[in-house]
């Protein structure tokens, strides 16, 4: 595997794509949907000149761009292949997603326990969406849709006849009242969640000591990403952690446009091990290194 491919940017990209949905935008491209936007450096001729020749058929049936902000081409994974943060991308029409039985989807992707599956909305979201409400219940989404429908009736239109049963002023008041009720409910939920967080602070602090240093760094980084509208590939590094929360032997930085990625070896506390070039162009093998 090329040192640029285990790009840790794939953690943020895959997680955001799976759980939040926004696409990744290159520099100059417009953001679609909500969520952070990753602005990558352009893949110009200088960056492409540093790429190795792409694999050829029959070993490779489809070429895709390497994960993160890399510019080189690599083989795409096929449907059913194992995937995750440190793997190549899935092929066209596929998406790397955790298995339905996974209790911690993001952690599964970080540990490479995902699989390439059809990217249709039904297959991706069925395991994460709540069960459909009974006919007598109305969800907030339905209320928003109904409110929007009522509000659209208020707007004059030459192509629509206003129903005499719905007076424009009365309909507009219903929209306002529903909006105020939703805001009040949201405030109540937020207040109750804050109270619960305060009560559980001591227990969370106690559990935090059980996590390894890599796990704590990774969670701090991901929590920080939630509040960013624009992500800079230069300033974010998501560590490679083992199941116990300690650092894996091999850590990598992703490619950044014309700048190639690199890897280095560390002990389980994240300290670089001597004798390994941290910015070498060749792949770094840490399998024989004992992380003590």
From Swiss-Prot:
Species in which this protein is naturally found: Rattus norvegicus
Keyword Oxidoreductase: no
Pfam family, one: Thyroglobulin_1
Gene3D superfamilies linked: 4.10.40.20, Thyroglobulin type-1
Biological role: Multifunctional protein that plays a critical role in regulating the availability of IGFs such as IGF1 and IGF2 to their receptors and thereby regulates IGF-mediated cellular processes including proliferation, differentiation, and apoptosis in a cell-type specific manner. Also exhibits IGF-independent antiproliferative and apoptotic effects mediated by its receptor TMEM219/IGFBP-3R. Inhibits the positive effect of humanin on insulin sensitivity. Promotes testicular germ cell apoptosis.
Complex formation: Interacts with XLKD1. Binds IGF2 more than IGF1. Forms a ternary complex of about 140 to 150 kDa with IGF1 or IGF2 and a 85 kDa glycoprotein (ALS). Interacts with humanin; humanin competes with importin KPNB1 for binding to IGFBP3, blocking IGFBP3 nuclear import and IGFBP3-mediated apoptosis. Interacts with TMEM219. Interacts with RXRA; this interaction modulates the transcriptional activity of RXRA. Interacts with LRP1; this interaction mediates cell growth inhibition independent of IGF1.
Domain IGFBP N-terminal: 36-119
Principal localisation: secreted
Polar residues: bias regions: 129-139, 192-203
Disulphide bridges, residue numbers: 40-69, 43-71, 51-72, 60-75, 83-96, 90-116, 214-241, 252-263, 265-286
Keywords from the named record: Apoptosis, Disulfide bond, Glycoprotein, Growth factor binding, Nucleus, Phosphoprotein, Secreted, Signal
Entry-linked SUPFAM superfamilies: Growth factor receptor domain, Thyroglobulin type-1 domain
GO terms assigned for molecular function: fibronectin binding; insulin-like growth factor binding; insulin-like growth factor I binding; insulin-like growth factor II binding; protein tyrosine phosphatase activator activity
Phosphoserine, modified sites: 149, 202
PANTHER family named in the record: INSULIN-LIKE GROWTH FACTOR BINDING PROTEIN, INSULIN-LIKE GROWTH FACTOR-BINDING PROTEIN 3
Highest rank taxon of the organism: Eukaryota
Protein's name according to its UniProt entry: Insulin-like growth factor-binding protein 3
Thyroglobulin type-1 domain boundaries: 211-286
């Amino acid at each position: 595997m090329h040192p640029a491919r285990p790009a840790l940017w794939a953690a943020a990209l895959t997680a955001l794509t799976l759980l939040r949905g926004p696409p990744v935008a290159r520099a100059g491209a417009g953001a679609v949907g909500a969520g952070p936007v990753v602005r990558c450096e352009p893949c110009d001729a200088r960056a492409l000149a540093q790429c190795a020749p792409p694999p050829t058929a029959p070993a490779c049936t489809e070429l895709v761009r390497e994960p993160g902000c890399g510019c080189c081409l690599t083989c795409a994974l096929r449907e059913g292949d194992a995937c995750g943060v440190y793997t190549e991308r899935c092929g066209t029409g596929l998406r790397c997603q955790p298995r339905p039985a996974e209790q911690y989807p993001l952690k599964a992707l970080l540990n490479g326990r995902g699989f390439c599956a059809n990217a249709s909305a039904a297959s991706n979201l069925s395991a994460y969406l709540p069960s459909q409400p009974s006919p007598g219940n109305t969800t907030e989404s339905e209320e928003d849709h109904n409110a929007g429908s009522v509000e659209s009736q208020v707007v004059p239109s030459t192509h629509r006849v206003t129903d005499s049963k719905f007076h424009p002023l009365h309909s507009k008041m219903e929209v306002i009242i529903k909006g105020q009720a939703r805001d009040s409910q949201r405030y109540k939920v937020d207040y109750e969640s804050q109270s619960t967080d305060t009560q559980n602070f001591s227990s969370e602090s106690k559990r935090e000591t059980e996590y390894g240093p890599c796990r704590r760094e990774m969670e701090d980084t991901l929590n920080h990403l939630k509040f960013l509208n624009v992500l800079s590939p230069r300033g974010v590094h998501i560590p490679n952690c083992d199941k116990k929360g300690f650092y894996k032997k091999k850590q990598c930085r992703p490619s950044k446009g014309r700048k190639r990625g690199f890897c280095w070896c560390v002990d389980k506390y994240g300290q670089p091990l001597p004798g390994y070039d941290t910015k070498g162009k060749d792949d770094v093998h840490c399998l024989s290194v004992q992380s003590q």
